[in-house]
Amino acid sequence: MGTDIATGNVMEAADTAMNVVADAVTASAMDPKQAMRQRHTVRKFTSEPLSAELILQLNDCVRANNERLRLAISLKVGDESALPGALKLFFAKGVRNYFVLAGSDRPGLDEDLGYASADLMLFAQTLGLNTWWIGGTFSRKNVEQAVPGKKVIGIVAVGFGATPGVAHKSKAASEVSSYEGPVPQWFANGVQAALLAPTALNKQCFQVAGAGNKVSITENGGVFSGADIGIVKYHFELGAGDAFEWA
């Protein structure tokens, strides 16, 4: 009996190890479109720290976005000063890693930061991490100290979520889009992807207009409209592919 129990324990341990490996492989093999469908806002995170490998991968993604879009985004790890005490007490938990969305002030900066933040959030999702885009409720003074002379529009909390989050309430495609003539499949796919994008207060106050292969996106002019447009553009591109051009 002792041998059978030992063998059973070994087999159980092996099965557990295989499941862990399988989960890791699934996360690493997730493509951006899958990440887009699975990503939801998470406001409570576990105490599990980011590994050195995860930090390296996230910083590589930050560097690529900074170089491509002339930004000054940075990743802060193990820093709990980004949120005010009241928010941490009642609304959020475990926010200690975050991207600072920053750059030199210029026309189009907010949109570029929104676009880059979408890339960072979905990349983090492919690594098995969760995110939360925070615009108006972070401790601006504490965060801005890390990037003197730069404009900061928000932060993106990143880490291991206590839950995977839930899908936000969404408008219908007809409420946020219009197309001149019969709607091509690529446009419909792009709009559906855009509806998965996180926007300020989840209001989805954007409009996508298409004619031929030209597409434009407008917003209602709120404080975060520039960032929202960038985030929505990223998602639309992911859904529509290369069948169109921005007007």
Listing of model-derived features with the role each one plays in the protein:
Residues M1-A247:
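Acidic, surface-exposed loops and disordered segments
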